[in-house]
Amino acid sequence: MKRNALLLLTILCATLSAQNYRPTAENLASRKDFADRRFGVFLHWGLYSMFAQGEWYMTNADINAEEYAKSMHAFYPHRFNAREWVSAIKDAGAGYICFTTRHHEGFSMWDTRQSDYNIMRTPYGKDVVRQLADACHEQDIRLHLYYSHIDWTRPDYPSGRTGLGTGRDSTLRDWPAYYDFMNRQLTELLTNYGRIDCIWFDGWWDHDQDSIPFDWQLPEQYALIHRLQPACLVGNNHHQVPFEGEDIQIFERDVPGENEAGLSGQEVQDVLPLETCQTMNGMWGYKIKDQNYKSAATLIRLLVRTAAKGANLLLNIGPQPDGTLPATALRRLREMGEWLRANGHTIYGTRAGGVTIGDDIVSTRNDDTLFLHCIGDTIPNEITLPSGRTIKPDRAGERNDCDYIISVRL
């Protein structure tokens, strides 16, 4: 009873403070820290990893929710080691991790009291979020928590345009009950696991084709988060310009402003920190036949192009069902880490350089230095800056294996 009263009071206070969001000093400091880190690793892991067909397998194959839920009784990631994950990611030069606490399949990867459909009811029986939180805090890696607004399993979730073949009874939809469920889960995550640096939402687009606009009641939910942890950032992968209460702007599979994948055509709002999320291979969740990994040079150039837009790169890996990270993904992390140890000063703590020449030269800058990144296949013979200044690279005309950098004092 006391827990219920406390939650209701917290939500009431959050509702009252949802209007005219003003970030706290702690939140503004978190925004700067986030932007300075520039590189994070996304981890999509849930029951779907066992099917090895990607994170949307449940809805793509129209699997009945009750039948799908039985897979939890076989989930036993006996080789999972949170400290090893975090160590590998830190060695890669990443400053934060974003982990899927609950994806669209509705399975919770922590010890939640709000549903029996969670990691503690599996043969594994250990709180994955707890282990990751402890490892991140020990190794000074920021922890961001992905949370889906969609649930293909719960009948109280008002179905949108996905998950329609999972056998839920649509007559049982109950938005107030589902909204309360989500807020209770978010309260658990923000009160039981120490410092959480960002809540990363996904799924708003599930109702973007409704004839009557769907009210997700986001301002109140965002206010709840900020009340529980004022420094915690809020981001939402809704593919729209930021809504009130959000602290970062997210772009899916695209560098801000480019929209080549067709998911991120929203206007870039430079008043907030920016983040691009992208896959290391093709899928977000583990797919056994997806070996289409991007080369290390491609990933490094993506990081450079993203930083040159003043944005962070959130690079995804889909862990395997046994709890290990794929060998190729680990190799790419090591290769990126090697490059960042030599060149991280041109990425970390920088902002958009403002100088772009064609497709082959982009830039970052700090207080007194402009870093010209030559990312074309060949190093140019000379570079003319907008100011008229001409620079002749000492390796002009040579093959460019990755990223040739020229530092220009301002």
Regions found by a protein language model. Give the residues of each.
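Mature catalytic domains of secreted/periplasmic carbohydrate-active enzymes
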Residues: 19-410
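Positively charged n-region of N-terminal signal peptides that target proteins for export
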Residues: 1-4, 89
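Non-catalytic RNA-recognition surface used by pseudouridine synthases
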Residues: 7
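Hydrophobic h-region of N-terminal signal peptides that target proteins for export
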Residues: 10-18
